[in-house]
């Protein structure tokens, strides 16, 4: 059906001038009028037209735009250009080179030209040169996002929305939009608008003077008078859940211009609205590959998406009601239990994973970097849901990568040198650890990795960087990610007759870099096995966790709360410094006396500091409190106890009351009063992993034996 494009342009003008929405006070808010005024005064560059707004006025025009987007982009741009003088109230203060150039040319033209003379079509100013704004369309909400493999020939020239993962991002480079030439004979200027990625420069001057005199003037490109725009190429790949059986994921090239550049990084899940266009091959490739043409998506709008849902990544702040719901009583336990609620038990492991997601605070004193990210290793028997926990964290973390030990090489984890298909230069392609920058990298089957590949992780886990010296490229890449590793013991199952080192068989240099190392054992216990079996059968039948008084939090809400927590930068007050140093010295002393199998070093103290700041972040506080330090020490002790759970019969037969007694006895000063403060004794025992109830029971038991006395106010324990 033929369309009158002049009438369509008038419709566009009317829409831009007259469209309004009522605000909360009932006043008319002219959405596009305000933006046009900003563009006229150079306060805004991009004008994004929401097709949902246009659908309220003219649904037919929306259909036409979706079918023939390139033509209507130019129509809308012409309409905006004609409307701008009406909205311009003052002169632009800061003028760039192109402004001055165009002003000079217009003044010269008005002086030297007869008013009745027609303008030569070859050297009249193209509209692209005069436009100082960019125009984009936002797809209507009724249009559904497509998979990469569903965008086919019927979508050519149409506005489509595609979802995928960004795999490659080129550098932003200037792309020529209008080429300006000067003739060496007559001095006339010629303009060449460029629509495609490649163009053939003009050589001979087309002006009337050169053609009349047959002087054969040659044209020279003037870069200062030409117009350039920012250009970037992305490669997106479809999601693994969208790939049919037996196929490999498809890729698509996306050309991004102007204000849409630098919005995505490799590894981001994005939704891109754009025009699907063909591009004929050029040069040598055209000769070799004949009539084949490539396709690409010319981007109009790029937004980051959530991984698991089809909605955009939530960046809005949490409301007061949502904050109140999260930060109610026992919110720490509630948040931890909301991590993988289908998995039974593992309360302390889930707390550690919650702190890993939140992370500690980075410090950079005088160029030396102290990491804030928390690294956790889950070691355990087969079938204790290690991989399930990893995959849940991969889904929950706003930015993450999931790899397995055997499927990852050292290059795949760090970086590879590749040849850029666009420019032909040697470039670096980031691996899993680089793609997980500012996020979490989950590595399953950590024990199956080759030793040569595993050494690539050492630098990342402490310095948070990757140093590369390959193919003449010397650089350092950022890899500020937390590492969550899952591994099986050396003999498949944990062998209690062997030492911890023989069971784990990972180098001490690597183990000391993990803040928490959990050993999850599958021990037979009738009551526990019964509850676990009931839980598993219920989940299998109903595909959800069993009903309980506790209601797990929504994944989207948790993701937004974790992002909010990361904005806090809590500090450790001076009042806690002595307490921390005393606690660390005590841990070193215990490691010496107990012949501890785990390695207690200065990194252990840094781990406690990281866990403490993560707990303070979780409470949205700016200062670390004593309870945070105690909880961090408790988690550290529990992770060590998990490693020593089967260390001979002595540790199994020792009752909690006996351990509490020996702990309190060690606190008694050698000289002076043989008494201990009740609160300090309780804190010491709780930090070692005992509950307040066990502490009370031990006090009563030894009080009946007349070993010590507790005063009535319960503030002091005195040895008899």
Swiss-Prot record:
Q: What is its EC number?
A: 3.6.4.12
Q: Name one GO biological process term.
A: regulation of DNA-templated DNA replication initiation
- Annotated ATP 1 binding lies at 344, 383, 385-387, 488
Residues annotated for ATP 2 binding in this entry: 513, 603
Q: Quaternary arrangement and interactors, per the entry?
A: Component of the mcm2-7 complex (RLF-M). The complex forms a toroidal hexameric ring with the proposed subunit order mcm2-mcm6-mcm4-mcm7-mcm3-mcm5. The heterodimer of mmcm3/mcm5 interacts with mcm4, mmcm6, mcm7 and weakly with mcm2. The N-terminus is required for interaction with mmcm3, though this interaction may not be direct, and remains in a complex with mmcm3 throughout the cell cycle. Begins to associate with zmcm6 at the neurula stage. Component of the replisome complex. Component of the CMG helicase complex, composed of the mcm2-7 complex, the GINS complex and cdc45.
Q: Which family does it belong to?
A: Belongs to the MCM family.
Task: Name the chain's protein.
Answer: DNA replication licensing factor mcm7-B
Organism field: Xenopus laevis
């Amino acid at each position: 059906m033929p369309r009158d494009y002049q009438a369509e342009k008038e419709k566009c003008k009317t829409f831009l001038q007259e469209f309004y929405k009522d605000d909360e006070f009932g006043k008319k808010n002219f959405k596009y009028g305000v933006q046009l005024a900003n563009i006229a005064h150079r306060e805004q560059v991009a004008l994004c037209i929401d097709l949902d707004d246009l659908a309220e006025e003219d649904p037919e025009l929306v259909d036409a735009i979706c079918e023939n987007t390139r033509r209507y982009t130019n129509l809308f741009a012409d309409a905006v250009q004609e409307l701008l003088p009406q909205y311009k109230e003052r002169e632009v203060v800061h003028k760039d080179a192109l402004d001055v150039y165009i002003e000079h040319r217009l003044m010269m033209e008005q002086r030297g030209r007869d008013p009745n003379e027609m303008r030569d079509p070859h050297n009249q100013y193209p509209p692209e040169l005069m436009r100082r704004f960019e125009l984009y369309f936002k797809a209507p909400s009724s249009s559904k996002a497509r998979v990469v493999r569903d965008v086919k020939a019927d979508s050519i020239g149409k506005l489509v929305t595609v979802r995928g993962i960004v795999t490659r991002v080129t550098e932003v480079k200037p792309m020529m939009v209008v080429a300006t030439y000067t003739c060496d004979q007559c001095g006339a200027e010629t303009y060449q608008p460029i629509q495609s990625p490649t163009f053939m420069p003009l050589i001979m001057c087309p002006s009337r003077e050169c053609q009349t005199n047959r002087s054969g003037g040659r044209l020279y490109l003037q870069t200062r008078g030409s117009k350039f725009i920012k250009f970037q190429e992305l490669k997106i790949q479809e999601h693994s859940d969208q790939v049919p059986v037996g196929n490999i994921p498809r890729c698509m090239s996306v050309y991004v211009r102007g204000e849409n550049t630098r919005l995505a990084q490799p590894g981001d899940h994005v939704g891109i609205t754009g025009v699907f266009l063909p591009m004929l091959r050029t040069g040598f490739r055209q000769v070799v590959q004949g009539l084949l043409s490539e396709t690409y998506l010319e981007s109009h709008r790029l937004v980051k998406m959530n991984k698991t849902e089809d909605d955009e990544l939530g960046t809005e702040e949490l409301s007061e009601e949502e904050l109140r719901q999260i930060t109610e009583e026992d919110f720490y336990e509630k948040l931890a239990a909301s991590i993988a609620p289908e998995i039974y038990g593992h309360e302390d492991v889930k707390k550690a994973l919650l702190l890993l997601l939140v992370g500690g605070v980075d410090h950079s004193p005088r160029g030396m970097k102290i990491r804030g990210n928390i690294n956790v290793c889950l070691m355990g028997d087969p079938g204790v849901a290690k991989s399930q926990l990893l995959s849940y964290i991969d889904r929950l973390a706003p930015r993450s990568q999931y790899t397995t030990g055997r499927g990852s090489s050292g290059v795949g984890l760090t970086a590879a040198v590749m040849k850029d298909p666009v420019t032909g230069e040697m470039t670096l392609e980031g691996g899993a650890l680089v793609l997980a920058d500012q996020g979490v990298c989950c590595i399953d089957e950590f024990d199956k990795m080759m030793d040569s590949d595993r050494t690539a992780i050492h630098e990342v886990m402490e310095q948070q960087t990757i140093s590369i010296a390959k193919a003449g490229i010397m650089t350092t890449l950022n890899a500020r990610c937390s590492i969550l590793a899952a591994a099986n013991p050396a003999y498949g199952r944990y062998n209690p007759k062997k030492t911890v080192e023989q069971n784990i068989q990972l180098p001490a240099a690597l183990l000391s870099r993990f803040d928490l190392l959990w050993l999850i054992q599958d021990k037979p216990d009738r009551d526990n096995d019964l509850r676990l079996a009931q839980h598993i059968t219920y989940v299998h039948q109903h595909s959800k966790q069993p009903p309980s008084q506790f209601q797990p939090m929504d994944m989207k809400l948790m993701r937004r709360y974790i992002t909010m927590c990361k904005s806090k930068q809590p500090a450790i007050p001076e009042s806690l410094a002595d307490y921390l140093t005393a606690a660390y010295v005590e841990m070193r002393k215990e490691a010496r006396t107990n012949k501890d199998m785990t390695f207690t070093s200065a990194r252990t103290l840094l781990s406690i500091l990281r866990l403490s700041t993560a707990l303070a972040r979780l409470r949205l506080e700016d200062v670390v409190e004593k309870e945070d330090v105690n909880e961090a020490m408790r988690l550290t002790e529990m992770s060590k106890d998990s490693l020593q759970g089967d260390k001979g019969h002595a540790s199994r037969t020792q009752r909690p009351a006996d351990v509490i007694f020996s702990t309190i006895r060690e606190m008694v000063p050698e000289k002076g009063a043989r008494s201990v403060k009740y609160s300090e004794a309780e804190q010491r025992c709780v930090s070692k992993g005992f509950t307040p109830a066990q502490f009370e029971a031990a006090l009563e038991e030894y009080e009946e034996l007349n070993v010590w006395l507790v005063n009535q106010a319960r503030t002091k324990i005195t040895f008899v």
